[in-house]
C-alpha cells in the first residue's frame, strides 16, 4: 500500500507518544518519531506547530496524502473567523472558540497575513424570529461579545442596502482570512522548528 510516498507503512511498535515506522525504500530501516500527525489541513498543522512550541525536542512528522497542504476543507471554505456567538456561553466550545479567535488574530497580525474584521449581521425577517434573535443577542453578551449590537431593520439596511429585515444583531468580531495562507505560514514555522512533512 502506498501512503503519501511510502511504499509500505507498518506500525511495528507504539507507546503513548512514540510510533515506529518501517519504510522499504528507506536507508534507515527504523526511523523513529515521537509524534506522527495524519493530515496537513489547518488542524493537523496547528497541532504540529503547537506541539513543537511546547516541546521543542520532539521528532515530529506530518503525513499528507495529497500533493500539497490544505487541499480539502481548509482550502475550500469561506474563510470565516468565528466569534462563537452561536455557542452556549461558558461551554468548552465557546471558551476554546474565544481563545482560538484571539490566537488567530495575534498570529495573522504577527505574520502580516491579510485579514479583515468585516463583521456580520444576523437577521430576523419574520416576527416569529424576533424572540430567538433577542435570546441570541443576550447569549452573545454573556459569551463576552460586549460590542455586539441589537439594531433595527432600518439600521441594518443602512449597513447593507440589499437587506430587508425587522431586526438584526451586528457582530463586529466576525472576520475573514485565507486559511490556506495561514497553513503555509504554519508549515514554515513547523519546518523551522525541525518538524517534517511528507506529501
PLM regions and their residue ranges:
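Dinucleotide-binding Rossmann-like beta1-alpha1 core, especially the glycine-rich loop
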Residues: 79-155, 159, 165
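A short, basic/flexible loop-to-alpha-helix module at the beginning of a structural domain
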Residues: 20-32
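N-terminal Rossmann-fold NAD(P) dinucleotide-binding loop
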Residues: 44
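Glycine-rich FAD pyrophosphate-binding loop
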Residues: 53-73
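Helical element adjacent to the flavin cofactor pocket in flavoenzyme catalytic cores
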Residues: 172-199
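Beta1/beta-strand and adjacent pyrophosphate-binding region of the FAD-binding site
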Residues: 30-41
Amino acid at each position: 500500500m502506498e501512503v503519501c510516498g511510502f511504499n509500505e507503512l507498518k506500525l511495528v511498535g507504539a507507546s503513548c507518544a512514540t510510533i515506529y515506522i518501517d519504510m522499504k525504500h528507506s536507508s534507515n530501516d527504523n526511523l523513529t518519531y515521537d509524534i506522527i500527525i495524519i493530515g496537513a489541513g489547518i488542524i493537523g498543522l496547528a497541532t504540529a506547530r503547537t506541539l513543537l512550541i511546547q516541546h521543542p525536542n520532539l521528532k515530529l512528522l506530518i503525513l499528507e496524502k495529497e500533493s500539497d497542504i490544505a487541499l480539502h476543507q481548509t482550502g475550500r471554505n469561506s474563510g470565516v473567523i468565528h466569534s462563537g456567538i452561536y455557542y452556549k456561553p461558558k461551554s468548552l466550545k465557546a471558551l476554546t472558540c474565544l481563545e482560538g479567535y484571539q490566537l488567530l488574530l495575534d498570529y495573522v497580525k504577527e505574520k502580516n497575513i491579510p485579514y479583515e474584521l468585516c463583521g456580520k449581521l444576523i437577521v430576523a425577517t419574520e416576527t416569529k424570529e424576533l424572540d430567538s434573535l433577542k435570546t441570541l443577542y443576550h447569549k452573545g453578551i454573556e459569551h463576552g461579545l460586549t460590542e455586539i449590537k441589537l439594531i433595527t431593520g432600518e439600521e441594518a439596511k443602512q449597513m447593507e442596502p440589499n437587506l430587508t429585515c425587522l431586526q438584526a444583531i451586528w457582530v463586529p468580531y466576525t472576520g475573514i482570512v485565507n486559511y490556506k495562507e495561514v497553513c503555509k505560514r504554519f508549515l514554515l514555522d513547523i519546518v523551522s522548528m525541525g518538524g517534517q512533512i511528507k506529501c
